[in-house]
Amino acid sequence: MAQVHLTIFIFSSIFVISSSSFIPPPHPFDPLTETELKLVRNIINKSYPIGHNHKFTFQYVGLNEPEKSLVLSWHSSPDRNVKPPPRQAFVIARDKGMSREIVIDFSTRAIVSNKIHVGNGNPMLTIDEQQAATAVVQKYKPFCDSIIKRGLNLSEVVVTSSTMGWFGETKTKRFIRTIPFYLNGSVNTYLRPIEGMTIIVNLDQMKVTGFKDRFTGPMPKANGREYRISKLKPPFGPSLRSAVVFQPDGPGFKIDGHVVRWANWEFHMSFDVRAGLVISLASIFDMDMNRYRQVLYKGHLSEMFVPYMDPNDDWYFISYLDCGEFGCGQTAVSLEPYTDCPPNAAFMDGIFPGQDGTPTKISNVMCIFEKYAGDIMWRHTEAEVPGLKITEVRPDVSLVARMVTTVGNYDYIIEYEFKPSGSIKMGVGLTGVLEVKPVEYVHTSEIKEDDIYGTIVADNTVGVNHDHFVTFRLDLDIDGTENSFVRTELVTKRTPKSVNTPRKSYWTTKRNTAKTEADARVKLGLRAEELVVVNPTKKTKHGNEVGYRLLPGPASSPLLVQDDYPQIRAAFTNYNVWITPYNKSEVWASGLYADRSQGDDTLAVWSQRDREIENKDIVMWYTVGFHHVPCQEDFPTMPTMFGGFELRPTNFFEQNPVLKAKPFNLTTIPKCTTKNE
């Protein structure tokens, strides 16, 4: 009888936590509830009429960052019996063509701060105004005439929005470009672009202010672009066996509101319309000290820079700052149980206001689950003891918090993985659909140009070269807020002639503690060094400073020249690692106003002050980079490409923190079969 082994892991039932159901007093980092968002709208509506006939729109609404000292005082108090910090909302709105910043206090139910933004750049685009802009284009007569002139069916045309960037203009208006695509037998929208049109929409006036048609070559065909399993035809494959996920005692983690407790970890997870998934107040329990110790005060996506490498008119402006322009929370999607997240996952909803301030919910926008991947936590076989052979192995398990944000054609998987050993892994997965351009070629032998700026991935279709730079903001509090950044260089030494050895060389370490921000800017790969955030006021019993080490993934750095306009706006990618002193206003690496920004309010600009960072409350910024030269395997959808980094305890514990972890049982069961099978 043929048998299939199904691995039993964990599960009781899928359950969902709705952020609108929590009862005050909330955790200081809880996302704004539906009730609070309605209150924000009502309070603002008393001062600024809101509605279809008024030019007042909500571009961003989120929790106004409470004072860190108050949060830590509340968090460290026994049973959280200290009054939590004042709860406030931060609002960016458009008001008659201006960007207005408003702070609302919930205890007084009043506006406590109100000012007009006077610098460069615009706030995040809303979904509503992007949809309105594309609707305007689809009714614009010159556009419709161009579509008909091409012999295309207007009803099969889809128009998408694209930011315009900045290319040296002294003043910029709130314009976007729109890009048309043709369906006509395909639902893979982004693989059939209609090129040769420049269509500019003024968002404040909601009208087309620029249109030009330069009719260009053939359109990619619709065939070969299907990706829905229900529409694909046999043969199917490769064949994968099913797995059963079962946990009779329920999941190993507990969720109290937005606070997650699992194994030796405790942390808070929430949702922000710009950042998406936010992890706060992550602490790990130290068995030797019998208490929780701080690791991460707050960590989240800060920005994603995605420049494309075609300098021609249809492409040069595509240099997205995804979080700042489109909102990585606003574009987050509902996760599919059993596929986006395994059956042992718990889910949380996300709530944010629409353009008119009305709350909108994304169901199942975040998930959390225990991950059993067959990895080994630690092991050792001892065969040198006479008469004994000892083998000790511990299977590994970790806890993963995940979200997916779909920004146009790309789906980004963002996850934080907590390990019992004390490590936190931050991961970024890239999948979705290529952004392509039509060409007359179907084979490389036909190419006439010096550069097609990409790869032929299908008939008449080039996948355009591009980059992804994903920047995380990590406010590390390693066993407290007084931290330093240590760069330990691995230096090759010649063996002294005075040493009686055949060895000619060895390496040793040279420790450098960064004094100011300039000392802490790191381009990975230039030299062998270890990067550690330490607490110089806390030491192990052997005298080592407690710390957490950065373990980078494969590093990529920008290849654009530094005076290129997209790179000026994204100068925060010039280094893989930055360290800055904590400043609650320095949250977004591209600046608070990223759309059409000019690079004058970015992480790179803040860091030019070269502030002191030794033995201070410091923040680490880390950029995960990808250079993407498309290939045929990326068509019609892309297998996930994964990158990331790890924060790993280094002299944080007195010994291996999982030494005494007991093995857990994993088992398999045979497949039930009939006699005739």
Swiss-Prot record:
Binds 1 copper ion per subunit. Can also use zinc ion as cofactor. The keyword Cytoplasm does not apply. Expressed exclusively in leaves. GO terms for cellular component: nucleus; peroxisome. It is an enzyme of class 1 (oxidoreductase). It is found in: Peroxisome. It comes from Arabidopsis thaliana (Mouse-ear cress). Its cofactor is Cu cation; Zn(2+); L-topaquinone. GO terms for molecular function: aliphatic amine oxidase activity; copper ion binding; primary methylamine oxidase activity; quinone binding. Disruption phenotype: Decreased nitric oxide (NO) production in seedlings after elicitor treatment with 2,6-dichloroisonicotinic acid (INA) in root tips and salt stress associated with a reduced arginine availability but with a normal nitrate reductase activity in plants. Reduced primary root length. Homodimer. Topaquinone (TPQ) is generated by copper-dependent autoxidation of a specific tyrosyl residue. Pathway: Amine and polyamine degradation; putrescine degradation. It catalyses: a primary methyl amine + O2 + H2O = an aldehyde + H2O2 + NH4(+). Substrate binds at residues 320-331, 407-412. Copper amine oxidase that can use putrescine and spermidine as substrates. Involved in putrescine catabolism in peroxisomes in response to salt stress. Regulates arginine-dependent nitric oxide (NO) production, a key signaling molecule regulating a wide range of physiological processes including responses to salt stress, by influencing arginine bioavailability. Modulates primary root growth. The keyword Phosphoprotein does not apply. Its EC number is 1.4.3.21. InterPro entries: Cu_Am_Ox_Cu-bd, Cu_amine_oxidase, Cu_amine_oxidase_C, Cu_amine_oxidase_C_sf, Cu_amine_oxidase_N-reg, Cu_amine_oxidase_N2, Cu_amine_oxidase_N3. Cu cation binds at H466, H468, H628. GO terms for biological process: intracellular arginine homeostasis; nitric oxide biosynthetic process; primary root development; putrescine catabolic process; response to abscisic acid; response to auxin; response to jasmonic acid; response to putrescine. The modification 2',4',5'-topaquinone is found at Y410. SUPFAM superfamilies: Amine oxidase catalytic domain (SSF49998), Amine oxidase N-terminal region (SSF54416). The gene is CuAOalpha2. This is Amine oxidase [copper-containing] alpha 2, peroxisomal. Belongs to the copper/topaquinone oxidase family. Induction: Induced transiently by auxin (IAA). Accumulates during dehydration recovery, wounding and treatment with putrescine (Put) and jasmonic acid (MeJA). Repressed by abscisic acid (ABA) and salicylic acid (SA).
